[in-house]
């Protein structure tokens, strides 16, 4: 007879990025999760522990180029090493997936199509840094320069690790291409943006009903206190990621498909094991 108090739990951990070895922070989180999962299984709960490698983006392209490898093959090798490390610490997963998967691409495209139908995305012409030697537009991690706020040197094109500010790559001072070491020019290009302000009321209402620590909730509500900047969700080719439907030269920014990777891992497991649904979905990530 089934235990009426049995809980069905889906547990996830932050996705390790596929450009290098696991660090102590990864191992701490995965160890804590593994202990919690084992404890709940011993208590008779139905628990599934999923994770995946975050396998897209500019840093992977840069590292793969340094290693003289194709990005896809490079990330496959990194994932093998990640799994070896986790196994050596006795950490087990019911399924370990990758964001570079058929399931994830399918889900990303479905969600993007729904966003288009809901008029939550639009195309806009912007100025962007361009490497004239490599003949390509430069995503944030392809650029280093001086922080436009505090003046710290050797900062990436998306944010300063010294003062914590985020900015557009076009605003960084004394920009240098990570690829060629040259100063980039500025060129116009069309990018696809997600209208965050249209979702502001929904997000505020959602947070009000969410059972999380008050300090975390207050910080998130603080972010929603003013106007939200629209989010550039596209990147120009060449880029290691998923192509955007009806935009042959555009790819989804890695932060579009990475969170959906949790759903993709779940879909893969459910399809393989003929499970219709799971009762709880959780992710310890404010962003």
Question: Where are the predicted features?
Answer:
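Histidine-centered catalytic micro-motifs
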Residues: 20-27, 93, 97, 123
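Short, solvent-exposed turn/loop segments enriched in Gly/Ser/Thr/Pro and often Arg
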Residues: 50-59, 99-104, 126-127
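Hydrophobic or amphipathic alpha-helical targeting/insertion segments
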Residues: 105-123
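A glycine-rich helix N-cap at a beta->alpha junction
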Residues: 80-94
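A charged helix-plus-loop insertion that forms the helical arch/lid used to bind
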Residues: 63-76
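Aromatic/His-enriched, Gly/Pro-containing loop or helix-boundary segments
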Residues: 74-77, 94-106, 132-150
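Structured secondary-structure scaffolds
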Residues: 2-51, 103-107, 150, 173-287
């Amino acid at each position: 007879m089934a235990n009426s108090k049995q809980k069905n739990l889906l547990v996830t951990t932050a996705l390790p990025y596929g450009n290098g070895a696991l660090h102590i922070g990864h191992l701490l989180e995965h160890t804590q999760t593994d202990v919690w999962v084992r404890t709940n299984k011993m208590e008779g709960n139905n628990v599934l522990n999923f994770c995946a490698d975050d396998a897209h983006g500019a840093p992977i392209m840069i590292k793969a180029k340094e290693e003289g490898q194709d990005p896809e093959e490079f990330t496959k090798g990194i994932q093998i090493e990640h799994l070896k490390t986790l196994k050596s610490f006795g950490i087990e997963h019911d399924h370990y997936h990758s964001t570079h998967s058929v399931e994830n691409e399918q889900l990303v495209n479905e969600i993007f199509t729904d966003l288009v139908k809901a008029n939550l995305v639009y195309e806009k012409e912007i100025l962007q840094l361009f490497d004239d030697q490599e003949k390509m537009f430069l995503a944030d991690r392809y650029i280093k320069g001086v922080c436009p706020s505090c003046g710290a040197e050797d900062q990436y094109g998306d944010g300063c690790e010294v003062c914590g500010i985020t900015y557009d790559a076009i605003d960084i001072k004394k920009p240098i291409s990570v690829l060629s070491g040259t100063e980039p020019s500025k060129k116009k290009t069309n990018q696809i943006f997600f209208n965050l302000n249209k979702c502001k009321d929904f997000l505020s209402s959602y947070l009000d009903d969410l059972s999380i620590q008050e300090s975390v909730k207050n910080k998130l509500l603080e972010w929603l206190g003013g106007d939200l900047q629209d989010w550039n969700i596209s990147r120009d080719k060449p880029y290691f990621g998923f192509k955007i439907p009806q935009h042959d030269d555009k790819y989804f920014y890695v932060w579009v498909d990475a969170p959906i990777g949790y759903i993709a891992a779940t879909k893969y497991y459910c399809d393989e094991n003929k499970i219709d649904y799971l009762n709880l979905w959780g992710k310890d990530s404010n962003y």
